[in-house]
Amino acid sequence: PLSSIISFFQNHKLFNFTNRPQWKTVKGGSKNYIKKLIQASHFDIKKSFKIDKIIRDQGVEILSQNKKYQFDLLVLACPPHHFLPLLGDKKEKEASILNAFNFQKNLAQLHQNSSLMPPHKAAWSSWNFHTNTNNKCTLSYWMNLLQPLDTKDEFFVSLNQNQTSNLYQTVYEHPIFSLNTLNSQKEIGKIQGLNDTFYVGSYLGYGFHEDGIQSALKVCKKLNINLGLFNEADTSRIQWN
């Protein structure tokens, strides 16, 4: 929807032709801030933990490999289509809102093929798009500028280009933003806390890391958790009340 695009451009100062903000990136990539969060946490972390079912009746019960784990509250920090099949019968009201969030799988490939970039290097930017006669658009990230990388070799990450020669590839899931999605981003406030369950994730904003963090901060505020320096943190990218 046009309103979403305009709001996105306003929030990211993309309408500014002068005095545009200087973007910053985490040194070493997002894995480093995730590592710091894990190191600073005050809770038990279980990785590669397969969940078979979630029962929410007088608290939360997690079933995993014939074992039961009891909790007071549940915070689901993953896309709805990952957790909805795990929830028990008490999910009709939640599903009516959460089913509006759709995702698309995108093939991401790391390569050195500069032919996908603008012909003139002066026009290269962090994000670049390439179209063909079939009206297919491919997005390419210039990693040397985006990270930045300390090397003379050029590296790019392209989505859905299906390069035959690539250094690495993986598949990501990205949220699809429709009018129903934007409405559900506001409606999800009605089910936050229902059945002792809360929802966080970048799909509640614009799909960026910042949106995932802001959605988590907003849930913490709703639970009256003391966040210290983050008590006054901005959560304006998340629309539910």
Regions found by a protein language model. Name each.
Residues 1-49, 53, 57:
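Active-site/ligand-binding neighborhood in enzyme catalytic cores
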Residues 28-35, 81, 214-217:
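A structural signal for well-ordered alpha-helical segments within the folded catalytic domains
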Residues 40, 44, 89, 222, ...:
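Active-site catalytic microenvironments for nucleophilic, acid-base chemistry
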Residues 41, 71-72, 195:
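Short, well-ordered alpha-helix to beta-strand connector turns
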Residues 45-47, 76, 199:
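A structural signal for the hydrophobic beta-strands that form the central parallel beta-sheet
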Residues 48-50, 65, 200:
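Conserved beta-strand termini and adjacent loop/short-helix elements that scaffold enzyme active sites
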Residues 52-177:
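Mid-domain catalytic core of redox enzymes
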Residues 135-241:
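Conserved flavin/dinucleotide-binding core of flavoenzymes
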